[in-house]
Amino acid sequence: MTLLSFPSVTDADLNPSIDNTINTSTLMIAIVNMRFQANFQCVFIPLLILSIDGRLVPSQHEVNEPLTIDTLSAGNSLQVLNRQTRAPVANTTVCYPVVGCFDNNEPFNNAGLEVPQSPEFIDTAFLLFTQESQTDPEFIVYDSDKSILNSSVSTSRWLRIIIHGFQNNRESVWIPKLRAELLKLKNDEQSDVIVVDWGNGAKFPLYPNAVANIRLVGRQVGLLLKKLHDLKGISYDRMHCIGHSLGAHACGFTSNAVENQLARISGLDPAGPFFAGKKTIVRLDKDDAKFVDVIHSNTEIALGLGLGITEETGHIDFYPNGGQTQPGCPSIGALIGGVLGGQSEAAFEQTSCSHGRSHGYFIESINSECPYTAFPCHDHESFMNGKCLVCPISGCAQMGFYSIYSLGRGKMYLTTRSNSPFCGYHYFVELVLDRDMAKTSGEIYVAVYSNYELLANVSLTERSNADIKAGDILRHVFSYHTDLGKVDYVMIYFQKAKAIFGWGGQKGDEILVSRLRLKSLEDTVIYSGLCETTTKVAAYSTETLLLNRFDCDD
């Protein structure tokens, strides 16, 4: 995202008013169907009609027809979700007092040609929480010198700015949690917090309008920060913008308004729809602040599902669990099945689970002793197969609040747990099969025990009918919420795949294990078993291996 000069006003304010009568499932259908058409050109999708250049156009229904579920299902374009009066027009510029002008010329045509709604309509609120007033906020007027001069913002503390995304506002559950954790910080990290509430401009179902509105909201925040800098002497080097979804991109526009001088931007799963593949001028990127860290938790997956952006957008980009769906949230198959099966509202909520996990991770990282260690790697598969388990000279990184102190840069991978506390200590298990073993298929599990307590149960094959061959080396990375300490033994279980209609019945009924290693990635401790012997694990049975704290190869 780079700075852009705006032309003078040439068109009137185009502010839609619309009844909020569409439920969440309709938006999910609209977004998913739009992606189907853009990516797969599936002509059977009913809600959208795309023109040759890929821009949304009105359908056979008049744009000023009353908006109802019936008219949508009959074939209205997503553009109907934007305004009841008329479709947006190309080459439009709107200007407002204080914030200036905005046009929808390329590349700012990424919001379906929408331009920002007026400041009066969006009604952005700025709530200041300080160390002295942690629950009773001051309301600051962003364009009032008097309001800013009379505010209680400290000149010595960090100023953290929180910007929410679509269909959120200051009452959204995660915002008070994040604010509270930030206000607990001590010493050099001690902070004041400004919560930016632009909920009126982020309301369902007007997603394209919300995409356009973040340009105006970001500029408003930037103007506030400039006045705090000029009037109160607060350094840009002590300003940190934290944004979720659309709010992450709004942080980029905020920093643009102060010539990209912000110390830091933390993007929590920056929004993907209308931003993926677009020029950096319209979305968050690493040039927007001195340090930009990004957590990707719901990147685009099969059939266009996914609310977050896939591209690297920061100095460090974290992809926990691969960045697509998160443990404890529905799988890719469940999401696709929900949409194709007509359960689109459930699918939207399921997708939101992974999308929202990004702020869950960030909130937890602020005051947790668990390090959220992440490793540089080319892709998630390579990481899970144990190919990126050593921190290079350039360094690993710590996902979340403390990433700014990490040496590592670029793409980082880690695993998390399925429920809170999400952070876990990483362990790598490697199982080597004997070269004289008969070929078979099924699933192999390893259960890890300490003091006779089960700590983790890991599938090394990740599916029930995996081919298992002589000499295979099976590897897997998993996490546990505390340091395991001393590991006593593991139990290996082999579940052979069942024959189907006579197929698969000739395969071996056992596996032969010649080596097992368990490595702690945070402290590099290695446990080994079977250095010089082989053990047999019959189908549907378990074998116990005692572990020693050394590497068989040493």
Describe these PLM feature segments.
Residues 1-2, 16-46:
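Classical eukaryotic N-terminal signal peptides for Sec-dependent ER targeting/secretion
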Residues 200-202, 272:
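Alpha/beta-hydrolase active-site loop signature
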Residues 257-262:
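Conserved hydrolase catalytic core segment
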Residues 263, 269-326:
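The feature captures the conserved acid-bearing segment of alpha/beta-hydrolase catalytic domains
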